[in-house]
Amino acid sequence: MSHPEEMPVDGTLDATGLNCPEPVMMLHQHIRDLPPGGLLKVIATDPSTRRDIPKFCVFLDHELVDQQEQAGTYLYWIRKNSV
């Protein structure tokens, strides 16, 4: 399988500089706009997203394909559930 950074995405959410709860609120809107099975890349700088985004995915049954940290930036690849 490809590395997440090489996978084509259906949308990107840049939440750089935003603090809780804004990244998750924006994520909710962006994921809603994706087609079922669509892949969203999220870029964030708020450390609380390490806790909040995985919980968001579990609660709403989306797949957290991968998450990475690169020099204080948090990257997430989320596949929208197909329901």
Curated annotation (Swiss-Prot):
Record PROSITE patterns: UPF0033
GO cellular component labels: cytoplasm
Active site: 20
Gene Ontology terms: biological process: tRNA wobble position uridine thiolation
Disulfide pattern: none
Record keyword Cytoplasm present: yes
GO molecular function, one term: sulfur carrier activity
Superkingdom to which the source organism belongs: Bacteria
CDD domains named in the record: SirA (cd03423)
Short name of any one Pfam family annotated for the protein: TusA
SUPFAM superfamilies: SirA-like
Localization per record: Cytoplasm
InterPro entries: Sulphur_carrier_TusA (IPR022931), TusA-like (IPR001455), TusA-like_sf (IPR036868)
Record keywords: Cytoplasm
Function field: Sulfur carrier protein which probably makes part of a sulfur-relay system.
Family that this chain belongs to: Belongs to the sulfur carrier protein TusA family.
Protein name: Sulfur carrier protein TusA
Source organism: Pseudomonas fluorescens (strain SBW25)
Organism taxonomic ancestry: Bacteria, Pseudomonadati, Pseudomonadota, Gammaproteobacteria, Pseudomonadales
